[in-house]
């Protein structure tokens, strides 16, 4: 078969695929994502799914495989973990809209997102208690810098580095993906490769510091980056590369990035990769979390608190003032056991607002993400009223929990207690929030009640007790009887009222003028109700995004409180003592115990 005989659908597929040669293309066809040619061969093997054929191209059968849209996240995660990148091409219009352009018109499709190891946001694709970092390493003349972000939380940080420090810096972050210029030096490339993350080469232009500065100023709405700190050219280039890559992978829908924070060289302890691995700080030598120092110390009850603990352990501070402030915070909750338990009890009810906010910003969120923001802020407000005289670190955290009454009130009034996952399912706007929606729902629901009455009337009229009114997506509503009643239904006088629609192996299906009219009424009301709910979802999403800064600050405050309370619980339950920390070189430990060994012995019943 020649290219001239390529079907319009396959021509569209090949055009989209040509723009993403390094990615597996998930091509939406109805309820499935289909893959073709080499993509199908690779994906079928990686996912352990059936490989089939569909038509011919250039004289060769077209390899094909597919996965259901509703289960696609699990398949995506498998592909990402096996080193693939995935371009997701969605249908940009309904088939009915395509038909208006002609009966041979193909439904418009385009890539809406490029899924890579460092750009995951879905709850099912992420580890709740760990950050998922995307890093960029820039080299400008003699400068080297590292920028990193977790787009699921919006964190954005940058620091100067060097050939000597880049290895330990990357080991500390354990990024999922690292961006590097195609023009990087060989020594730098070799050092970055050692971190084990997926490496993504970008063009030299993506690391241009001048264009990066302009882009960052526009993104953050400032005239100069000096408002956030004094950044070197390599630091600006690294941040710019991150933003460029996010723009590419998210197809123009940038995540809600926090204002950039610059980490100073010497602000935290440098630990090289080998030492970090041998110390088993965040992971045991086996690669798992169990058996690590992190597992032994983690008493946090929120996902954000757990992520903060891992960051603190991976990057021990060298700032004596900051260390003392953290110790003061823990001590205050060690001394007040009642407050500590009250605090932890409330925190257990706090959802992962960081990641809910990120999904809403990327337009991938649903009603449950709105509910997570509402429920989290309700608990934040509750805590702010309970917590009084606290050390400075915790007092600052509590301040961020206040001032959310307006948003909480709006979300509480608008949402049901337990919304569905997806906005398209409807049923998430609370009764009483919108009179028009309530009326439309009543019409829809009453129409469905009339169906039951109509079925009873038809049973009485025909004398067929087994007659049912059913619904499917092909025929809509229809009257169904078993085939042994077909002759009666197809003969006068019943045939004058019941119009034959379909005969199957064991059933015969009919419609009536009254049933068709009622179906139109029900469908119109149902569709109208769903459209109203979708409008409310967008209004609520925008209301949350307008308060994104204060909401993000509240999540950071809750994480700080959770971490302090968790460490205080550890100190009380396991009899840990507060260290005396000063700027001397003295290291004096009396009666020390190994936390990981002690935990292992307790779990084995030996300690």
Model-found features: residue ranges?
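Conserved NTPase motor "head" modules and their coupling/switch loops across ABC/AAA+ ATPases, GTPases
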Residues: 4-5, 488, 497, 539, ...
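A conserved P-loop NTPase coupling/switch region
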Residues: 32-53, 145, 155-157, 168, ...
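Long, charged, glycine-rich C-terminal linkers/tails
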Residues: 91, 254-263, 457-470, 568-591
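Short His/Asp/Glu-rich catalytic/ion-coordination signatures at enzyme active sites or charged loops
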Residues: 362, 418-436, 507-510, 514
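Coiled-coil termination/hinge junctions
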Residues: 445-473, 554-560
């Amino acid at each position: 078969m020649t290219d001239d005989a390529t079907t319009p659908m396959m021509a569209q597929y090949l055009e989209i695929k040509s723009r993403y040669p390094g990615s597996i293309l998930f091509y939406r066809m109805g309820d499935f994502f289909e893959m073709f040619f080499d993509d199908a061969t690779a994906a079928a093997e990686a996912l352990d799914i059936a490989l089939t054929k569909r038509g011919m191209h250039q004289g060769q059968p077209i390899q094909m495989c597919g996965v259901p849209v509703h289960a696609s996240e699990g398949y995506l995660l498998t592909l990402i973990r096996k080193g693939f990148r995935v371009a997701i091409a969605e249908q940009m219009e309904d088939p009915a809209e395509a038909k208006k352009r002609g009966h041979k018109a193909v439904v418009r499709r385009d890539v809406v997102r490029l899924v890579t190891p460092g750009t995951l946001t879905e709850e099912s694709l992420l580890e709740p208690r760990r950050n998922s970092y995307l890093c960029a390493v820039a080299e400008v003349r003699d400068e080297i810098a590292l920028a990193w972000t977790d787009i699921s939380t919006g964190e954005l940080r940058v620091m100067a580095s060097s050939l000597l420090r880049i290895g330990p810096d990357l080991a500390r972050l354990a990024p999922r993906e690292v961006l590097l210029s195609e023009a990087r030096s060989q020594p730098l490339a070799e050092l970055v490769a050692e971190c084990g993350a997926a490496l993504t080469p970008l063009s030299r232009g993506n690391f241009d510091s001048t264009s990066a500065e302009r882009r960052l100023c526009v993104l953050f709405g400032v005239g100069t980056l000096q408002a956030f700190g004094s950044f070197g050219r390599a630091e600006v280039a690294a941040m710019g590369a991150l933003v460029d890559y996010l723009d590419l992978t998210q197809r123009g829908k940038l995540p809600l990035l926090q204002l950039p924070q610059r980490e100073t060289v010497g602000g935290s302890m440098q630990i090289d990769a080998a030492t970090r691995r041998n110390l088993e700080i965040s992971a045991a030598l086996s690669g798992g979390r169990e058996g690590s120092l992190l597992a032994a110390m983690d008493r946090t009850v929120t996902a954000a608190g757990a992520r903060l603990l891992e960051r603190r352990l991976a990057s021990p501070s060298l700032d004596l003032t900051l260390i003392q402030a953290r110790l003061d915070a823990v001590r205050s909750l060690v001394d007040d056991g009642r407050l500590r338990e009250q605090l932890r009890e409330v925190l257990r009810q706090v959802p992962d607002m960081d990641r809910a906010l990120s999904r809403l910003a990327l337009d991938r969120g649903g009603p449950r993400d709105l509910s997570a923001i509402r429920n989290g802020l309700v608990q934040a407000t509750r805590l702010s009223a309970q917590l009084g005289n606290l050390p400075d670190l915790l007092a600052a955290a509590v301040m961020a929990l206040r001032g959310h009454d307006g948003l909480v009130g709006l979300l509480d009034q608008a949402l049901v207690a337990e919304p569905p996952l997806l906005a398209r399912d409807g049923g998430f706007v609370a009764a009483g929030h919108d009179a028009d929606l309530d009326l439309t729902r009543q019409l829809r629901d009453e129409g469905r009640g009339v169906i039951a009455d109509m079925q009873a009337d038809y049973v009485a009229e025909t004398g067929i007790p087994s007659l049912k009114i059913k619904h499917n997506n092909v025929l809509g509503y229809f009257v169904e009887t078993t085939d042994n009643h077909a002759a009666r239904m197809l003969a006068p006088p019943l045939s004058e009222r019941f119009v034959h629609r379909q005969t199957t192996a064991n059933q015969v299906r009919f419609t009536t003028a009254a049933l068709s009219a009622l179906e139109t009424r029900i469908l119109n009301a149902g569709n109208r109700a769903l459209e109203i709910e979708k409008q409310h979802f967008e209004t609520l999403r925008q209301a949350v995004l307008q308060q994104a800064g204060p909401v993000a600050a509240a999540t950071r405050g809750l994480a700080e409180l959770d971490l302090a309370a968790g460490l205080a619980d550890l100190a009380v339950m396991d009899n840990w003592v507060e260290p005396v920390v000063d700027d001397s070189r003295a290291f004096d430990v009396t009666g020390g115990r190994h936390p990981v060994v002690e935990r292992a012995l307790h779990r084995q019943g030996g300690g």
